[in-house]
Amino acid sequence: MSSEKSGLPDSVPHTSPPPYNAPQPPAEPPAPPPQAAPSSHHHHHHHYHQSGTATLPRLGAGGLASSAATAQRGPSSSATLPRPPHHAPPGPAAGAPPPGCATLPRMPPDPYLQETRFEGPLPPPPPAAAAPPPPAPAQTAQAPGFVVPTHAGTVGTLPLGGYVAPGYPLQLQPCTAYVPVYPVGTPYAGGTPGGTGVTSTLPPPPQGPGLALLEPRRPPHDYMPIAVLTTICCFWPTGIIAIFKAVQVRTALARGDMVSAEIASREARNFSFISLAVGIAAMVLCTILTVVIIIAAQHHENYWDP
C-alpha cells in the first residue's frame, strides 16, 4: 500500500497532460540474464523489426522503470512509432550527410520582381504581318564631307509590342543612321545619288555676341614718323630712344617675333609721347620767360629815363 501511494493521490486532480500514467510499483533488482538471452533478445528485436514498430519506455510516478518491468508491460504502457519496412539499409552515398543530420529542402531562388508599376493594362502586341520588312542594304553615294555614326557597336532587337517581360534585360535595336557633317563654307550637295548637287545661295546665319570670328592679327605700329618729329622739334634725347625702339619693331616683324614687336612698339610710343610732352613744356616755358624778360626790359628803360 505504501508503494502504491508514492504517486499522486486520487483525490488530487492530475496536473500532467493525458494520458495519465498510473502509479507503478518500485523497481525490483534485475535478475541475471540467462545464457539464451542474447538469442531471445535478438529474436525479440527482430520481431519488432518485422512488425514495423519500436517500443519506448515511459516515465512513471516513481521514476524510470527497469528493463524487466518494461518488457513485462509490453504494449500496454508503451508508445509505438512507425518504422520503415525491414530491409537492408543502403550504403551512404557520395556527398551525403552523416547519419543523424537533418537535410533541409533547397528552396528555389526568389523570382525577379519589377519595381516599375504600370497604371493601365499593357497594349496588345501588333500582329507579325503588320511589321514592315527591313529595307535591303543599298550602295548609295555619300555626300562630300565627314560621316559621324550615331551609335557604335551592335545591340539586340526590341521585341514586338514595345515592352520587355520582367526578369530580362532590355535590348535596343541598332541605329544605322549617319549624320553628314559638312565643313564651314562648303555648299550642300544633295539630290539623288549620282545627280548634281544643289548649291545653297543663302547667306550664313547671323552670329551671336559669343561667336566672334577670328580675324588675322595685325602687326604692331612702329611709330617711326612721330619719333623723328619729336626728336627734331621737341626733345631730342628721348626722341632718339623712340627712333631706336621703332627700328626694333621693324626688325622683330621681319623675323616673325610678334611678342617682341609689340613690346618695342609700346616703348617707342611712350618715348615719343615723352619727347612731345617735354618739347611742349619747354616751348611754353620759353615763351613765358621771353615775355617776362621783355616786360622787365621795358620797365628798366622807363626807370632810367629823365
Swiss-Prot record:
The gene is PRRT1. Residues 276-296 dip into the membrane without crossing it. One of its GO terms (cellular component) is glutamatergic synapse. The chain crosses the membrane at residues 224-244. Residues 1-142 are annotated as: Disordered. Disulfide bonds: none annotated. Changing A94T: In a breast cancer sample; somatic mutation. It is found in: Cell membrane; Synapse. It is a single-pass type II membrane protein. Component of the outer core of AMPAR complex. AMPAR complex consists of an inner core made of 4 pore-forming GluA/GRIA proteins (GRIA1, GRIA2, GRIA3 and GRIA4) and 4 major auxiliary subunits arranged in a twofold symmetry. One of the two pairs of distinct binding sites is occupied either by CNIH2, CNIH3 or CACNG2, CACNG3. The other harbors CACNG2, CACNG3, CACNG4, CACNG8 or GSG1L. This inner core of AMPAR complex is complemented by outer core constituents binding directly to the GluA/GRIA proteins at sites distinct from the interaction sites of the inner core constituents. It comes from Homo sapiens. Required to maintain a pool of extrasynaptic AMPA-regulated glutamate receptors (AMPAR) which is necessary for synapse development and function. Regulates basal AMPAR function and synaptic transmission during development but is dispensable at mature hippocampal synapses. Plays a role in regulating basal phosphorylation levels of glutamate receptor GRIA1 and promotes GRIA1 and GRIA2 cell surface expression. This is Proline-rich transmembrane protein 1. The keyword Transmembrane helix applies. Residues 1-223 are cytoplasmic. Pfam families: CD225 (PF04505). PANTHER family: NG5 (PTHR14948), PROLINE-RICH TRANSMEMBRANE PROTEIN 1 (PTHR14948:SF21).
